[in-house]
């Protein structure tokens, strides 16, 4: 944990304190919405851009320079730990992560290569380069949650309903647990590499957990998510847990042992806080769809989100999902200016 960021608005809010200004950052703030990103990425494959430390660092820094957000989020991809372990995976444009061979049997899981600490050196180097330039602005490390990683591995590609992993949990729980634990250790090591190299907080993204009911989540997923975070708890950095479509899972997601819960755009923050019993700071949850609405509509919505978030023990503004690629970057800058102009309670 970088001592220079301890008093930053972001870390203060994550710890339930009173920040000097309202902190805001955006999921997917680094990436396709920025012309400068498209320029440096030209001719470079997605996963290659994540593994070139200078390039990954530059992409991470771009939105901080442009928008004056209160945090950088490390530019990478949730399947990078798979690639670094030696699993055949690539990002296919217009599709997403595609594996050379799905993982569907006990033999498949037993044959998975193990991620090594040495393989993570490009990640550590990119983080070191980034924090050296960020100064007092915190860098958030991130990793995909084990369920989301394992879901990709079972399906072999993105899926709408995740029937494969959901069937495996019940049909072959032993194999499922072995796979979830493999994914937990890969994710946990990936996050640990970022935090040890200087990231100030860590976020676990469970993109696909919304396909699960609460009982399945608690039984088949939560233990693996807790295991992933066990790799980094000793470092003392604030930990955030976010999933999409997870309104019914928020309490269980908190209970894997995190400091902050991210809320997607579907659930108002005052209701999320009520469900969580006012126990943790919240992050979110501006609706990305409204970034393309008239400014008066977007401004009213942002103010509404701030009001709903004021009920929680702490609030970091964010979107309720990632920045859509077609977003006008000037709108994001204007949203940041608006949030910073509203004095903290």
From Swiss-Prot:
Keyword Lyase: yes
Residues at which substrate binds: 28-32, 77, 152, 207, 321
KW Cell cycle (keyword) present: no
One GO term of the biological process aspect: protoporphyrinogen IX biosynthetic process
Gene Ontology CC annotations of this record: cytosol
Predominant location: cytoplasm
Pathway in which this enzyme or protein is active: Porphyrin-containing compound metabolism; protoporphyrin-IX biosynthesis; coproporphyrinogen-III from 5-aminolevulinate: step 4/4
Subcellular location: Cytoplasm
PROSITE patterns membership: UROD_1 (PS00906), UROD_2 (PS00907)
Assigned EC number: 4.1.1.37
Reaction catalysis annotation: uroporphyrinogen III + 4 H(+) = coproporphyrinogen III + 4 CO2
UniProt KW keywords: Cytoplasm, Decarboxylase, Lyase, Porphyrin biosynthesis
UniProt-annotated site: Transition state stabilizer, residues: 77
Catalytic EC class: lyase
GO molecular function, one term: uroporphyrinogen decarboxylase activity
Family affiliation: Belongs to the uroporphyrinogen decarboxylase family.
Known partners and oligomeric status: Homodimer.
Cited function: Catalyzes the decarboxylation of four acetate groups of uroporphyrinogen-III to yield coproporphyrinogen-III.
Protein name (record): Uroporphyrinogen decarboxylase
Species: Arthrobacter sp. (strain FB24)
Source lineage: Bacteria, Bacillati, Actinomycetota, Actinomycetes, Micrococcales
